Amino acid sequence: MTETSPPPVLDTAQARVLGCLIEKEATTPDAYPLTVNAAQVAANQKTAREPVLNLQTGVVHHALRQLETLGLVRQQFSSRAERYEHRLGSVLDLTRQQVALIGLLLLRGAQTLGELYARSERLARFNDADDMRHHLDRLIQRGLAAQLPRASGQREDRYAHLLSGELDVEALQAAAARAAPSARSGSDTSDLEARMQALEATVVELQEALAAVQARLDAAGA
């Protein structure tokens, strides 16, 4: 793909899984690349996801293989399991900051500049909000993101990715209105999300360790 190539069109599962790979590369590098099981756990997280999904293992595996076909994901083999890493930055010639922004938009839908800035801390470094706006403008110029028109009562611009085709602006505005009453402060939310992600990564590592032990026991008993 080049800068003039149209962006890929991803379905819901593909978009969620790609976003998870981007996130976990930065937040849990020791567990990255991800196994199918780890990708499923990440995709179905109850925190830092909009909407919350319940993807089955087969759906996640299929999404990974489709992303691999598109060149956005690469499979790596280890002694224990298949592992997958994203290639979004190299395939679309994006900076780390731009990849982080796409990842956040894939995982949490349309967001304001302030929300993106608060949530990006663990994914990439931005000098300030103006620096982030510069990277968002670049994504918009590339046709990878869009700035949404403000709905009635909204005071800030919102941004969304375009990797899943044309946007349903009315649906995005309705989702933003539903989310507004339950919004928590950025610092409290970021702290909670960090703890939850660390716990979820630990659970995945324990599950994989148990699976490896079970495989050795099965082999010994064969």
Swiss-Prot record:
Database matches in SUPFAM superfamilies: Winged helix' DNA-binding domain
Family membership: Belongs to the UPF0502 family.
Organism superkingdom: Bacteria
Xref: Gene3D superfamilies: Winged helix-like DNA-binding domain superfamily/Winged helix DNA-binding domain (1.10.10.10)
Organism, as annotated: Xanthomonas axonopodis pv. citri (strain 306)
InterPro entries assigned: DUF480 (IPR007432), WH-like_DNA-bd_sf (IPR036388), WH_DNA-bd_sf (IPR036390)
HAMAP family linked: UPF0502 (MF_01584)
Lineage: Bacteria, Pseudomonadati, Pseudomonadota, Gammaproteobacteria, Lysobacterales
Protein name: UPF0502 protein XAC4278
